[in-house]
Swiss-Prot record:
InterPro entries: DHOdimr, Dihydroorotase_CS, Metal_Hydrolase. It comes from Helicobacter acinonychis (strain Sheeba). Its EC number is 3.5.2.3. GO terms for cellular component: cytosol. Homodimer. NCBIfam families: pyrC_dimer. PANTHER family: DIHYDROOROTASE. Gene3D superfamilies: Metal-dependent hydrolases. It catalyses: (S)-dihydroorotate + H2O = N-carbamoyl-L-aspartate + H(+). This is Dihydroorotase. One of its GO terms (biological process) is 'de novo' pyrimidine nucleobase biosynthetic process. The gene is pyrC. It comes from the Bacteria. It is an enzyme of class 3 (hydrolase).
Amino acid sequence: MEITLFDPIDAHLHVREGVLLKAVLKYSSEPFSAAVIMPNLSKPLIDTQITLEYEGEILKNSSNFKPLMSLYFNDGLTLEELQHAKHQGIKFLKLYPKGMTTNAQNGTSDLLGEKTLEILEDAQKLGFILCIHAEQAGFCLDKEFLCHSVLETFAHSFPKLKIIIEHLSDWRSIALIEKHDNLYATLTLHHISMTLDDLLGGSLNPHCFCKPLIKTQKDQERLLSLALKAHPKISFGSDSAPHVISKKHSANIPAGIFSAPILLPALCELFEKHNALENLQAFISDNAKKIYTLDNLPSKKVRLSKKPFIVPTHTLCLNEKIAILREGETLSWNIQEIA
């Protein structure tokens, strides 16, 4: 059995920087045609110049791959800066509520504040797409749900602004997407295939710790259903977020799952299991092209066959190891050719 996927797109990706970028980028740039690149670096991408420099680093270390750059939402985004960014081909803004995830200490503290709404008004006029880490302070399993009132306000106040709920994790958010024409979402492999049991049902597994948290079986099943039918308002976004093992095994574990090396084989396995392989092309590419109005992307064909793929236990960054999701397991699908 074989399947060929055309122009895979990862609508939410972390490729880090420096030597770590050089170690992990290939796992995304080789099989994927394009990816929406997250801006929460140690030095966040708060303006056009910094963002273009980072884009250059990605392009220097990849080929036949389009990084779709995003700006870190901040109070310094004047109308002039947004116009400059748009002129340079940047079409995404990423809003992080302050402190909700990795490198979000510079995030937005008042999501409904006057300055935030002013920037969103400008973004709407210029045709930006707003990607939001949709969590609010509260009990860890309810943080996405607690952000619903903010999402509703944004959707009503800016009806022409496309708003993406990144890494949808709570089944209660599905109703919002179906209610509001301008609300969309991305789904990760881990949120549609894993639950809290994978994180802490046995021994604590730090390599399954992410934000937003993987949640209950009900959440996983409802989200998987969206993916399997390739809901037209949903696109795939891996949120692949590598950390070296020494940090993942520390007392202060950073959130992030490194899934990039297994994404396409694991998705094939999952969709075949549920008799939905015919919908994988839409989930992995076609929906994103429509939602984000993407064209002129690098052409890519990825042929996968039903042959065993043993997931490596790790990859290397200098002398440090980076653990890979489902390390050591055997997947039933494997990439045979990328053209």
